[in-house]
């Protein structure tokens, strides 16, 4: 007796591998990440463990693929490091034809923010100021101008667009909040008012809050920063940028050139460079309460005279140590990377 067709079909289905099984069979093996130089790993661990504060350190070889660090999987406040992701989003928008670097942008008093905003002088002097997308990006990166950054963010689609780019490009453990006004107000325990953008109004409003409330919100931010990022995610993003995996060749080159002209943090990562080495970077500096600072960072790409590059991130979550000690830490991280490079490649440029 011939079996019913449905029974034969069922038998075939039973014998066929499931879609999940096929996926497992078809999935290529993930190549293990190359081992980082042991001496460098030991040096970074010594630097991190010896620092009086909560610090994360990460280094990744752009060319070799290895990475190493100290407490580099934790989330640290980005502060103005997040401007890098606004710039990345802007250049992505350029690549997709949504904006042009030459597009004019007009800022008014309603665009002003707080803290560091050099562009505010031009706005206040005339009531408005017209510039370009590119000049906003340059000011946001090289001067860490909060007003330029927030305006650029809105021009390219707002905080949601920055978060979309981070997610679509699979950049990892990186959070992005709603711009400098919202970020700094929330840390302080305030709801943003545009009146805070003028003079010392923000400081007065912040100082009027109960210290117990300010301390509670400040510590909550440090423990779970809503603009947090892990140093490993940062260096992986920087390495991918340098390799041309995130933007077009022209946009990659332009962004790295702008980052190479950063004027802030001249004695952070930059202070550890040896002759012939270059740095493209972005700093971040957070609010201080009771002598404790929430966020003191520098992230960037250092490039050797032979062209090999390393992504580096030093992110201090919480510390009250003197600035010179923090800068020395960053200097020493860079020197450790350069020393391992020279030990491996000096006199053997074919490797």
Q: PLM ranges: what are they?
A:
Residues 19-23:
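Sec/Tat signal peptide C-region and signal peptidase I cleavage site
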Residues 25-189:
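Active-site-adjacent loops and short helices of periplasmic peptidoglycan-processing enzymes
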Residues 129, 190-198, 279-286:
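Carbohydrate-binding/catalytic loop surfaces
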